A protein has these predicted regions:
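Bilobed periplasmic-binding protein-like "clamshell/Venus-flytrap" ligand-binding domains
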Residues: 1-11, 148-161, 248-257
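Extracytoplasmic/periplasmic solute-binding protein
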Residues: 1-36, 43, 79
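Glycine-centered hinge/linker elements that transmit conformational signals in sensory
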Residues: 33-64
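Short helix-initiation/N-cap motifs at beta->coil->alpha
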Residues: 62-76
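Beta->alpha turn/N-cap motifs
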Residues: 67, 84-90, 121-123
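Alpha-to-beta junction loops
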Residues: 76-85
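C-terminal lobe and pocket-closing loops
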Residues: 92-99, 113-121, 125-219
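A structural supersecondary motif
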Residues: 101-112
Length: 257
């Protein structure tokens, strides 16, 4: 269970549900017209029903993300699985040396009837061509060099690994064919983390639709998940309250196309 600290009380983040469980289950918060459908959506019931099952069966560790309490739990081997993005590798290598060699990587589990892995996320950069912009061409050169120069990319990755710092796989499929991107990792017991990162992007689910109201919606949904985790309501009640409060506080969302 991912949470953030708030004055000593954990606050549940809906972010991982939005990027992981919900897309994998084909869930929807809004329909194609921006109307709230989370209360009647079968995908939502699948996604949050899975969360409910894991919680009811005592399979979730309730702690704070990216803080010492979680790393201590990992090093004490109280955590067996993370459903999380590849970025988490950096924090594991940096803070959980005691578990080196114990971990393995796999694609996100698929929901029956949906058969899609987790939804991939991307990073975008943009150049605003407005007036005199003397560095736009330099930026383009740097970006292409960083993205497609295999030797330079490999040198950078080695440096980042030595620092236990984050790095990303190239977007070039040609570069990914290099043996470098299939090298085994001691931290993962000889499995190639780099290769698995690429494989785990295969058969990805579609991301949820994007709206300008998403930040507010996340707060509403997260509040109901918090009440559920606190034992104040069932998951069915939580979903019903999400639906009711989204309709009352936001109403119709603007769909970004």
């Amino acid at each position: 269970m991912e949470s953030a600290s708030d004055g000593g009380r954990p606050r549940i983040r809906n972010l991982r549900c939005r990027r992981g469980l919900m897309p994998s289950a084909g869930a929807k918060i809004w329909d194609e017209n921006g109307e709230v459908v989370i209360g009647s959506d079968e995908g939502t019931k699948k996604a949050l029903g899975a969360l409910d099952t894991m919680n009811t069966e005592g399979l979730l560790l309730k702690t704070t993300i990216m803080e010492p309490a979680l790393y201590d739990a990992i090093n004490k081997k109280q955590v067996a699985t993370f459903c999380i993005g590849a970025f988490w590798d950096e924090f594991m290598r940096k803070n959980c040396e005691a578990t080196k060699g114990d971990w393995r990587v796999m694609s996100a589990p698929e929901f029956e009837g949906v058969n899609k892995a987790g939804a991939p996320v991307s990073q975008y950069m943009g150049i605003i061509e407005k007036g005199d912009n003397p560095y736009s061409e330099l930026f383009r050169m740097m970006w292409y060099d960083f993205t497609f120069d295999g030797a330079a990319k490999e040198e950078w990755v080695k440096s980042m690994e030595e620092q236990n710092a984050p790095y990303s796989n190239p977007v070039s499929k040609e570069l990914l064919q290099s043996d470098f991107w299939k090298e085994p990792s001691d931290f993962y017991g000889g499995m190639s983390f780099r290769e698995m990162e690429g494989k785990c992007l295969e058969n990805g689910a579609e991301n949820l639709v994007v709206t300008p109201q998403d930040a507010e919606a996340d707060e509403i949904i997260s509040a109901e998940l918090e009440n559920y985790v606190a034992g104040n309501q069932t998951m069915d009640e939580a979903i019903a309250n999400m639906d009711k409060n989204l309709k009352a506080k936001i109403g119709k969302a603007e769909i970004v196309k």
